[in-house]
Amino acid sequence: MLKSVLLAGGGTAGHVNPLLAVADEVARTSPGVSITVLGTREGLEADLVPSRGYPLAVVPKVPLPRRPSAAWFRLPGRLRAAVEAAGDAIDSSGAQVVVGFGGYVSTPAYLAARRRGVPVVIHEQNARPGLANRLGARWARAVAVTFPSTALQGAVVTGLPLRREIAALVEERAADAAASRRSAAERLGLDPSMPVLVVTGGSLGAQCLNETISALAAEI
């Protein structure tokens, strides 16, 4: 019987939100299971995870250099420290499975779990898998992806885990789109009779979108 699970992921909301959605579902369906989240002090998880009510264990942030630089020489030592910290989190929590969502924290979590013979389960949110999940997928017990086109061997398409609050909004709109739109406009203080343009973007791309839309606001 599953008693403890460690969820690893962080850095951006793209990793943290699906992680929290899974954590919430585990807590709802298996209230006896202990849930620990593994992240970093620098990522969004440092705020989002505790505010959601889950304990957060941290590891040092170890970005993988994409180009040859002095950082390559520091990588082995930094990665070793992160793997040790991830291993301590697995041991102290008694985790029987590690579920990873990608990001800097997932690589040391996967490596520490492998050393201990703890099963690894992976979810990849993006169409193009990140380095951590490409590595972990080599020995993961199961791999889930959002998109059918994601190139990870043996992956099962599950879609993107959504928090129940978000799923409820989707269901509300499907049931009555007009009423859902009117309700949302009123909550945001907008005129329901006027067109509404929503512009959204993630991570670094959001800044470019914000600047472009701000510059074009008068014309729009």
Describe each region flagged by the PLM:
Residues R114-R182, R187:
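Active-site-proximal region of nucleotide-activated glycan assembly enzymes
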Residues L7, V37-L38, I122, V145, ...:
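Structural beta-sheet core signal
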Residues H15-A27:
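Short amphipathic alpha-helix
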Residues L2-A13, G32-V83, T158:
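Conserved nucleotide-sugar phosphate-binding/catalytic loop shared by glycosyltransferases and other
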Residues A85-V98, S106-V121, R134-W139:
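Glycosyltransferases and closely related glycan-assembly transferases
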